[in-house]
């Protein structure tokens, strides 16, 4: 009898408004939690860029750093997908011809919506979209022929609306725009033929700024400075931040010093490279080099593709080999396009070597035949002499230095 009365009491309590309200609150919390989780999976854009829903960051923050690099359209799930022709939804999507929605999407011909989208011909909406021919809306988008709306967009022929846009032929409205033929309205604009309204311009017609010299190179001095180099066939086109003086001697040098700086190199026909890099310390080199040291530095070459991180020294020739977790390399034509992180010094001797040292540093280079081009990130590599490759010496100073083989 006592058990029956207890059961009746429990049922009575459950039928009260108190318990119903508790259940409603629990349900509301569950829905809210799921919603927040979904938004978080898409990534939250930093600062003024707001947040991205499902991997669709629509802008970058106050410091231009999109943080949405995952989630998005659930066509498949992440991981390090190299040569993924399907629908990865996240992870390191290299050579993804489908619809990656996040992660490091390199050479994505589909519709990546986030992450480091390099050579994205589809519709990336965020992340580091390099060579994006579609409609990226945020992130570091280089060579964007579509309609990027934010991020570091280089060679944007569409309508980028913000971020670091280089070679923007459309209508970028803000950010660091170099070679902007459209109507950028702000930011550090170099070679702007349109109507930029402010910022440090390197070789820009409307405004001023700290311009460099030597074969149309425009090194910068200051936080989030920008520069471009077009010198000859072995020149480099670069964007970079430099809160400290940059030094170089000849060619299209693009040294950088700063946090989240970027740089690109396009020179020597097919023997060129396009890279972004960060350098919080002075860089010293001699000819067509783009060394970097940074947090999330990136680089792109013209041949091969690979991502890898390394915590031990690397010794290799003109291949993009790696040592460590998630390492991949593509030999092919004896070249490699590689991103990697390395926490220990790397050494090399000749060819297209791309050693690195740093946190999420990156490097790129095309293989021999078309020239060797290497970017690297180093955080501790003291050298008073430097390296000699192909008869060219690349001196180092202090902790940082890099080189490009032409």
From Swiss-Prot:
Could you say which tissues express the protein in this record?
A: Expression is confined to the prism and organic layers of the shell with no expression detected in the nacreous shell layer. Also expressed in the mantle edge, extrapallial fluid, hemolymph and, to a lesser extent, in the viscus (at protein level). In the mantle, localizes to inner epithelial cells of the outer fold and the outer epithelial cells of the middle fold at the bottom of the periostracal groove.
Signal peptide as annotated in the record: 1-19
Q: How does it sit in the membrane?
A: Multi-pass membrane protein
Give the GO biological process terms: biomineral tissue development
The residue ranges crossing the membrane are: 26-48, 58-80
What's a single GO CC term here? Answer: membrane
Q: Where is the region 10 X 12 AA tandem repeat of G-G-Y-[SG]-G-Y-[GS]-Y-G-Y-P-[AT]?
A: 78-197
**What's a single GO MF annotation on this record?**
chitin binding
List locations, semicolon-separated: Membrane
Q: What is its main location?
A: membrane
Ordered alphabetically, the record's keywords are:
Biomineralization, Chitin-binding, Membrane, Signal, Transmembrane, Transmembrane helix
Relate the protein's function as given in its record. Answer: Binds chitin and may serve as a framework constituent participating in shell formation. Inhibits aragonite precipitation and may regulate aragonite growth during shell layer formation. Does not affect calcite crystallization.
Protein name from the UniProt record:
Prisilkin-39
Organism of this sequence: Pinctada fucata (Akoya pearl oyster)
Lineage of producing organism: Eukaryota, Metazoa, Spiralia, Lophotrochozoa, Mollusca
